[in-house]
Amino acid sequence: MSKVGTSDSKNTLYCSFCGKSQHEVRKLIAGPTVFICDECVELCMDIIREENKSSLVKSRDGIPTPKEICKVLDDYVIGQNHAKKVLSVAVHNHYKRLNHQTKHNDVELAKSNILLIGPTGSGKTLLAQTLARILDVPFTMADATTLTEAGYVGEDVENIILKLLQAADYNVERAQRGIVYIDEIDKISRKSDNPSITRDVSGEGVQQALLKIMEGTVASVPPQGGRKHPQQEFLQVDTTNILFICGGAFAGLEKIISSRGRTTSIGFAAQVLAPEDRRTGEIFRHVEPEDLLKYGLIPEFVGRLPVVATLEDLDENSLKKILTDPKNALVKQYQRLFEMENVELTFADEALGAVARKAIERKTGARGLRSILESILLETMFDLPGLEGVEEVVISREVVDGTARPLYIYADRTDRAAETSASA
């Protein structure tokens, strides 16, 4: 105690814990022989909250169940039920392992990193982002195409840990429980079956560099960038408990899987489809580690990704639901933009189907929906702020097909529609 809570000649009272006078604090609470200020009370409450939080983690997992994780994923990601189940179970088990690793020292539970395989625009990145939002842990994304071996032009794999540390506000303890999503992982496949032909600094070399941080190592991370501040102290980050999720479209992998020919049906009534007649996502469901090895991933790298979740192609109905159902659906976003102009935006059901078919034709999946809507609504969003009296804008199938312009409905004369079905 710095100062006893007694009064001086001016009868000034002091906090018995921090020593501040009654004039320096908002409130001073008196006890039988001591005084405590409001700041010390708040500090004590913070300590108690942290203690309660840690005891809660010890008594319970502190993370949602797989069903709860899957339910939240349903709010943001349409379809992909199998991938959601695989991810929910894998993430739940990973954090359950973290919370109980000090209790069960007799059995060491290995980490299960995740590999997401699916066509472009099927929701791989969105699944990883939503998982990080559910679990409230630091999350970072990295592009595998920018990674090179140390010493070559490009990003080192240690930069991934630096980004995760920045997402955790340089809290090393939080960063060591975070999630790293590495996109375009198929782009670092080995360029040739013969590994000794040439130096592959962005393919097999990156796979070798990623092995260390994915399995678990203590990475030395310069918090402000090593080149600009060479004298700074390095932060030590243990990657053992960081969950790595790798995703990629793996274009051409379906041909390797089909060439195995082990998924064909047998019998007179069996319907055997040629590879070109089967959807890519359906073929991906039968992927085996040997297929990934033939694609160009090295055996050690495949071994670090024991959990494989395959995503399916999005059909027309799924794409229509993506446009309207999620909390952050594209149609809802554009309707909100039009509401700011006091205008209601309406899409006909046939128009949504036409947008979905366009995305399927372009083979861009859900990622291409925004660009399609942007091109459809560009002229309307350009003209609308300068128009008066517009109450509603209606988008029909003909508008999506490019044979008509949006229908403008005015507030003063509801029976009049401007900009009607003029040829584009």
UniProtKB/Swiss-Prot annotation:
Among its keywords, does the record have Hydrolase?
A: no
Give the binding site residues for Zn(2+).
C15, C18, C37, C40
UniProt: ATP binding residues? P119, T120, G121, S122, G123, K124, T125, L126
- Which domain of life, per UniProt? Bacteria
InterPro entries from the UniProt entry: AAA+_ATPase, ATP-dep_Clp_protease_ClpX, ATPase_AAA_core, Clp_ATPase_C, Clp_protease_ATP-bd_su_ClpX, ClpX_bact, P-loop_NTPase, Znf_CppX_C4
Which residue ranges does the record assign to the ClpX-type ZB domain? Answer: 3-56
Query: What keywords appear on the UniProt entry?
Result: ATP-binding, Chaperone, Metal-binding, Nucleotide-binding, Zinc
Q: Which GO terms describe its cellular component?
A: HslUV protease complex
The record's listing under Pfam families reads: AAA_2, ClpB_D2-small, zf-C4_ClpX
Residues annotated as signal peptide: none
Biological process (GO) annotations?
Answer: cell division; proteolysis involved in protein catabolic process
The protein's GO terms of the molecular function aspect are:
ATP binding; ATP hydrolysis activity; ATP-dependent protein folding chaperone; protein dimerization activity; unfolded protein binding; zinc ion binding
Known role: ATP-dependent specificity component of the Clp protease. It directs the protease to specific substrates. Can perform chaperone functions in the absence of ClpP.
Give the UniProt family note. Belongs to the ClpX chaperone family.
Q: What quaternary arrangement does the UniProt entry report?
A: Component of the ClpX-ClpP complex. Forms a hexameric ring that, in the presence of ATP, binds to fourteen ClpP subunits assembled into a disk-like structure with a central cavity, resembling the structure of eukaryotic proteasomes.
Task: Report what the protein is called.
Answer: ATP-dependent Clp protease ATP-binding subunit ClpX
Give the originating organism. Rhodopseudomonas palustris (strain TIE-1)
